Amino acid sequence: MRIYEAELNDELLKKLIDLSAKWENEDISYGYRKNSREDIEPNRIFLAAGGDEILGYLFGHTEKAERTSSVINEGTPFFEIEELYVLPDHRSEGIGRELFSFVEQKVKSEGLEYIILSTSTKDFNSILHFYADIMGMDFGNARLFKRLNQAKN
């Protein structure tokens, strides 16, 4: 397996959109919809590949904090992960961990002090285990919801 930062081109864009459609069809994240060109283009793209097959991807971008929060001071540059996805048949193989670690080392070498992300998974126990226990992230906040009325079909 190879982990690397990729340049976006039309072929890669199509592959990433197709992978995001698979993610959407899994129905594992609240409100997730497949990506469009506009969702992907402003981001740096990192891939995990086995031969010619993309096994997983991570994309995100660098920003500066607009205001001081309990975690980060105003003006501090950070890398925000927009998406991290691994194909279902390749989960629990360490691909997500390797993608995250690769990006962590890359942005750290560029002088960034933080990686930040939000997640919208239906399995919060697994995602907290991955990000907090395995990747060493601190838990900053949570946004919970309770649906009061079921959608009518």
Segments predicted by a language model, with ranges:
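Active-site rim helix/loop that mediates acceptor-substrate recognition in acyltransferases
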Residues: 24-50
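Conserved beta-strand in the GNAT
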Residues: 47, 53-62, 80, 85
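Conserved acetyl-CoA binding element of GNAT-fold acetyltransferases
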Residues: 72-88, 142
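Conserved acetyl-CoA-binding loop-helix of GNAT-fold acetyltransferases
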Residues: 86, 92-105
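Conserved beta-strand-loop-alpha-helix junction that forms the acyl-donor binding cleft
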Residues: 116-127, 145-149
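Conserved acetyl-CoA-binding loop of GNAT-fold acetyltransferases
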Residues: 131-142
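A conserved beta-strand-loop-helix scaffold within acyl/acetyltransferase catalytic domains
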Residues: 58-74
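Short amphipathic alpha-helix that is part of the acyltransferase structural core
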Residues: 1-32
